[in-house]
Design a protein with these regions (language model features):
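Tubulin/FtsZ superfamily GTPase core signature
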Residues: 1-290
Length: 290
């Protein structure tokens, strides 16, 4: 759903979309043009039946089709998004991650873990999937669905799930903007690669603020995404910070001091890459930390 939403909204420029599923019917109803029914012999297009091992076999059956789709064109980076705990996402996503990494692509996983009411068995299966994903991608973001109940309890179900989708799209859009927008202190794909390659568990998020102390407030918002399961970055090894500034209210030298105060809390061994760029949307100020 998140991928279909991003594709139809056009909110992530410079990104192409590919759907992989064992369920042929689900693919048929998706608006995404590029899709692969994985494991047609293994599953007969009927899904993995909540069995990760069957989905893993399906992905391996379609390994060459997946590899060809990922390496065609000028692709340098792949986001793999999947739900953990069921069959297809849990079993196939790690295989797809390994295919992408073997092709030399920078590979980022963004996965969800289930609600508590979905049961212990599904949660344990999801956690095993997360473990396998950590071994199959360069960097991994984990979105905890249980937090939807805790944080958005007064929202409708569709509104709450939309918040989870936004966490995914913000990460993809943040990277897309960073690579495609020329900055005053410019960052590019090489900086993203340096930060995320073999990075482990990651936080990729965007914070918006305006007015007094907007730098500090934007940093806090970027770090305090309620749905990210691992948003404590005190032990981070790499920081990539890009600040987008409004032409009506350019960044001041004193605001750089606020940024310096934030980075001083980290170990001297942390490698920090910093850039600035003009804001190309309506927000007054954006600070992005990855």
């Amino acid at each position: 759903n998140a991928v279909s939403k991003m594709c139809t909204s056009g909110s992530v420029p410079g990104v192409s979309f590919l759907l992989c599923n064992t369920d042929a019917q689900a693919l048929h109803h998706s608006p995404v043009e590029d899709k692969i029914t994985i494991g047609p012999t293994v599953t007969k297009g009927l899904g993995a039946g909540a069995k990760p091992e069957r989905a893993r076999e399906a992905a391996l059956e379609s390994k060459e089709a997946i590899r060809e789709a990922l390496t065609s064109g000028e692709t340098r980076m792949v986001f793999i998004t999947a739900g953990m705990g069921g069959g297809t996402g849990t079993g196939a996503a790690p295989v797809i991650g390994k295919i992408a990494m073997e092709a030399g692509l920078l590979t980022i996983g963004i996965v969800t873990i289930p609600f508590l009411f979905e049961g212990t068995a599904k949660i344990l299966q999801a956690l095993e999937g997360v473990k396998q994903m950590r071994e199959s991608v360069d960097a991994l973001l984990v979105i905890n669905n249980q937090r939807l109940i805790e944080v958005y309890k007064n929202f409708t179900v569709s509104e709450a799930f939309s918040k989870a989708d936004d966490t995914l799209s913000n990460a993809a859009r943040g990277i897309s903007d960073l690579v495609n927008i020329t900055g005053t202190i410019n960052l590019d794909f090489a900086d993203v690669d340096t930060t995320l390659r073999n990075g482990g568990v990651a936080v990729i998020n965007t914070g918006y603020a305006e007015g007094p102390e907007r730098m500090t407030l934007a940093i806090q918002e970027a770090l305090n995404s309620p749905l990210l399961n691992n948003n404590n970055i005190s032990k981070a090894r790499q920081l990539l910070i890009n600040v987008y500034e409004s032409s009506e209210a350019p960044m001041t030298v004193s605001e750089l001091t606020e940024l310096q105060t934030f980075t001083e809390d980290f170990s001297d061994k942390v490698k920090t890459i910093y850039g600035t760029a003009p804001r190309q949307r309506s927000e007054e100020h954006t600070s992005e930390l990855q």
